[in-house]
Amino acid sequence: MEEPVLRRTWAEIDLDALAHNYQQARRRIGPHVKYLGVVKADAYGHGAIQIARKLEQLGADYLAVSSLDEAKELRHGGIQAPILILGHTPPAMVPQLIEYRITQAVSALAKAEAYSAAAVESGGTLKVHIKVDTGMSRLGFLVREGHFDTGVESIAAACALPGLEAEGIFTHFAVSDEDDGDSEAYTRAQFDVFTRVLDALAARGRTFAIRHCANSGALARYPEMYLDMVRPGIALYGVGADAQRLDLRPVMSLKSSVSTIKTFDPGTDVSYGRTFRTQGRTRIGVLPIGYADGFFRGLSNRMSVVTAQGPAPQRGRICMDMSMIDLTGLPDVKVGDEVEIFGCRQRVDDLAAILNTIPYELTCAVSKRVPRVYIEGGKIVGRSLRLL
């Protein structure tokens, strides 16, 4: 493979791994269930346009983003697949939603009425998916205990508004990725509420072409919840709690290279705050990656990077642009050698566990100044560097 971006710091995006993860889900859901790939937040840091292009090539039926700007970016990048905006869009932007052929999630009757008025005024029709709050307590028509009948009536009223085409209806699970009994019961209760909503709407003559609720956790655990479409996010990128269960491969590998090596005497303090002191003669390597690149400062002195010769403990505080590693036991590592922060040899999940967070916080945090290098068939097929 040719040298990626002058071998400073980069994120390798393995499109073959992406294809593998997509096919794993396809085999699981069968030929009659649609596949929506979630590419919001720049495809969880992987590069939305490039990931969306690959998903479109693979046959994804739908894509999902968080905002109109994200949706427009995909359209400007040549993406033709249907796109669902999961988050809020101001009603004033409805003409753009229609122009760009974007489907909008609708989470309340008042919003539906505002979207309807804007669509009618523009002379077009806005395709929408109804969002139902069955237990996430975030966006969505409220249909839980004490609100079921009024919630269903509000959904029916929203679907009947002029200028709107209610193509789909969906909900979002709060703990479908957890294996304990309480979480399973909660997920099943959410699904039960959702199916009751569907039945109540069907009794009123309102049905939908696309019913969806299965996120990555439900994809791995609850095949009865696949309905018309699944909606994997983190599973698409091969990380998270279900990567092993679904036989997924990590798509992103964050890499850097050794820029400098120095040997220090015992008692030498390393980096800000003097949080590491050498105990013997110590060979320290400097990496051109820091917390401004997405290498979390909270990992300081708590993990190792991976070299071709083995793991190298990180030493001292991680700086904004640089970090230090201990090469004392790795005499063959030299300036210019590649190191892996996370990826195939060190899972991002393990670093997330150190930080008591989720792995996609780490992939999303890989900053825009880190070039994405796209690999397919062992060759570089694209690069992306976004500083603006």
Regions found by a protein language model. Give the residues of each.
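A charged N-terminal "starter" segment
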Residues: 1-103, 117, 125, 165, ...
